């Protein structure tokens, strides 16, 4: 039996490995592949750490110069998994690097003394967790966040369908996971109906809101000043990564309707689209700007980068 097939001795401190290969918790949310999942993983890890559980978040290194370990918060570390090539790797390319990533995962695991549980996020991370779990006996739970079959059922115009290889990979993760954590009842239902997940192994954990950060107060004035917006303007916003299926064009079309119906509002309204391009929608920002110009509301619609 190889070293990889031997379950490590349990670490003296309760320790969980969280895996999110295709995006880093250190990246700015709202750009590229960094989005809501990043926030979800970070905040969940901090909460577990506050309960006495050490959490190591594993992500694929995008440069050989990145440190092996970065402390994100007390009890939470980011660990970089090194695999070549570093650059020019899309989400769909990650499975081809899996042998290298798994090997480097074992290097980290040996360093810390092992994990009691692996929690993987997104399907490519689930492939790594499935392999490590099968070789060591460490249980793994998985959160998909999105799935190929659901995305392909509701593609926006111009969006590229998710490949069959992703659906097959997701099916294998569903079968192997000790448990699957869904964010909503509808997501749980889709895993059962589309992926034949065992209902007894699917759990719904509804995401919450950090009320210490998001609360009623006097932050509106500060936010307007930060974004360079007139304090007296009526503000309409789209906040998120710029992808067709998120519907940023809906805001632009709605603003055009409002301006046509009530021209007097033109000088009183700003519509803000805040976010960066992501996924297959790399040309989406230019399309949105052209749409605003074509509808005659480019003076009302403003595009801003993500704000931390």
State the predicted function of each range.
Residues 108-125, 129, 138-139:
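Short N-terminal targeting/anchoring amphipathic segment
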Residues 16-17, 133-153, 163, 181:
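Active-site proximal beta-strand in glycosyltransferases
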Residues 215-229, 288:
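A short helix/loop element that forms part of the nucleotide-sugar donor recognition site in Leloir-type
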Residues 61-63, 163, 168-204, 209-211:
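A short, active-site helix/loop in glycosyltransferases that binds the activated sugar's phosphate group
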Residues 230-246, 252-255, 272:
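Conserved donor-binding/catalytic core segment of Leloir-type glycosyltransferases
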């Amino acid at each position: 039996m190889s070293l990889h097939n031997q379950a490590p001795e349990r670490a003296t401190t309760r320790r969980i490995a969280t895996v999110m290969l295709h995006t880093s918790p250190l990246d700015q949310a709202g750009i590229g592949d960094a989005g809501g999942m990043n926030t979800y993983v970070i905040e969940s890890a901090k909460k577990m750490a506050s309960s006495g559980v050490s959490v190591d978040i594993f992500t694929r290194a995008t440069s050989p110069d990145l440190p092996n370990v970065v402390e994100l918060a007390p009890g939470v570390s980011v660990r970089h998994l090194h695999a070549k090539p570093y650059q020019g790797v899309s989400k769909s390319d990650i499975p081809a690097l899996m042998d290298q990533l798994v090997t480097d995962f074992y290097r980290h695991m040996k360093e810390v003394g092992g994990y009691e549980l692996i929690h993987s996020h997104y399907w490519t991370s689930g492939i790594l967790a499935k392999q490590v779990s099968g070789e060591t006996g460490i249980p793994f739970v998985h959160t998909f966040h999105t799935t190929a079959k659901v995305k392909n059922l509701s593609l926006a115009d111009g969006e590229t369908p998710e490949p069959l290889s992703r659906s097959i990979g997701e099916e294998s993760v569903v079968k192997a996971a000790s448990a699957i954590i869904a964010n909503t009842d509808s997501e749980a239902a889709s895993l059962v109906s589309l992926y034949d997940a065992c209902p007894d192994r699917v759990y719904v954990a509804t995401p919450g809101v950090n009320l210490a950060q998001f609360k009623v107060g006097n932050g509106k004035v500060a936010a307007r000043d930060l974004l360079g917006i007139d304090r007296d303007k009526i503000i309409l916003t789209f906040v998120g990564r710029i992808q067709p299926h998120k519907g940023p064009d809906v805001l632009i079309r709605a603003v055009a309707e409002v301006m046509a119906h009530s021209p007097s509002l033109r000088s009183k309204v700003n519509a803000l689209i805040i976010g960066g391009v992501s996924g297959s929608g790399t040309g989406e920002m230019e399309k949105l700007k052209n749409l605003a110009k074509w509808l005659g509301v480019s003076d009302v619609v403003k595009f801003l980068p993500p704000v931390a």
